[in-house]
Regions:
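Conserved short alpha-helix immediately C-terminal to the canonical SAM/SAH-binding motif I
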Residues: 40-41, 78, 102-105
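NAD(P)+-binding Rossmann beta1-loop-alpha1 motif at the extreme N-terminus of oxidoreductases
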Residues: 1-54
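Rossmann-like NAD(P)-binding element
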Residues: 56-96
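Conserved residues at beta->alpha junctions
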Residues: 36, 73-74, 99-100
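Rossmann-like NAD(P)(H) cofactor-binding subdomain of soluble oxidoreductases
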Residues: 82-116
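Short, solvent-exposed coil/turn elements at secondary-structure transition points
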Residues: 38, 56-58, 101
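Short, charged, surface-exposed secondary-structure boundary motifs
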Residues: 44, 64, 104-108
Length: 116
């Protein structure tokens, strides 16, 4: 729907894939913001003009308030922790991922009853 096209995007993990997605969405003038675990990485992104933080609870609370689509772009070993944070701070947001493996991510979603 047109509402989904306008929906802000919150990217969790700003490495190669998440960072590329953030830059492309900014370039297309889409509302996007992100989280990076590394404080220095977050600072670098902020200096480059991107809307980024290293405070996951705050960015997820913002995503919840904005009804944002959350994109998980972290290494597989961080997904469980990220999902725990999403359950706590952004339980009504839509979620997708760009993690390189799918079966394990799906199992983590199913374990929480988060499938759609």
């Amino acid at each position: 729907s047109s509402q989904d096209v306008q929906r802000p995007v919150c990217i969790i993990g700003l490495g190669l894939i998440g960072g590329s997605l953030l830059r492309d969405l900014v370039a297309s003038k889409h509302a996007v913001y992100g989280y990076n675990h590394s404080t220095s990485g977050a600072r670098s992104a902020i200096k480059a003009g991107y809307d980024v933080t290293d405070d996951m609870p705050a960015i997820l609370a913002r995503a919840e308030a904005d009804d944002a689509l959350i994109v998980i772009a972290t290494p597989m070993n961080a997904v469980d922790s990220v999902l725990n944070q999403i359950e706590e701070h952004a339980p009504s947001c839509g979620i997708t991922d760009v993690v390189s493996v799918k079966t394990e991510v799906r199992e983590l979603f199913l374990k929480r009853g988060m499938e759609s």
